[in-house]
Amino acid sequence: MEARAIAKYMRISPRKVRLVAENIKGKPVEEALNILKFTPKKGAEMLSKVLYSAVANAEQIPGVDVDSLCVDIVKVDEGPTWKRIQPRAMGRAYRIRKRTSHITVVVKEM
């Protein structure tokens, strides 16, 4: 059986989350959580929250052994971009793009 968790509109660039997401793909859940715990990136904290949620969702399925779960799919998609204006000198303005991410984690039994 598999369980999934999705976090939408996370306020971090997908490019930054994908750096961390590649490290946990295919790993057992305990090992993946340890990797995320000791990775000094903002994306690691967000991924660990989604991974904990996926494990909690798997616990709700009858007959699933939580200790034998492994990370099957980690998908980071681009969400909508928030446009903001940064005032500059001499009446100019620069556009700031605040990027968002949709993070999907799927865990399954080994």
From Swiss-Prot:
GO biological process: translation
GO MF term set: rRNA binding; structural constituent of ribosome
One Gene Ontology cellular component annotation held by this UniProt entry: cytosolic large ribosomal subunit
Pfam families linked to this entry: Ribosomal_L22
Gene3D superfamilies listed in its UniProt record: Ribosomal protein L22/L17
InterPro entries referenced in this protein's UniProt entry, alphabetically: Ribosomal_uL22, Ribosomal_uL22_bac/chlpt-type, Ribosomal_uL22_bac/org-type, Ribosomal_uL22_CS, Ribosomal_uL22_sf
General function of this protein: This protein binds specifically to 23S rRNA; its binding is stimulated by other ribosomal proteins, e.g. L4, L17, and L20. It is important during the early stages of 50S assembly. It makes multiple contacts with different domains of the 23S rRNA in the assembled 50S subunit and ribosome. The globular domain of the protein is located near the polypeptide exit tunnel on the outside of the subunit, while an extended beta-hairpin is found that lines the wall of the exit tunnel in the center of the 70S ribosome.
PANTHER family linked to this entry: CHLOROPLAST 50S RIBOSOMAL PROTEIN L22-RELATED, LARGE RIBOSOMAL SUBUNIT PROTEIN UL22M
Family, per entry: Belongs to the universal ribosomal protein uL22 family.
Name by which UniProt lists this protein: Large ribosomal subunit protein uL22
Organism: Maridesulfovibrio salexigens (strain ATCC 14822 / DSM 2638 / NCIMB 8403 / VKM B-1763)
Gene name for this UniProt entry: rplV
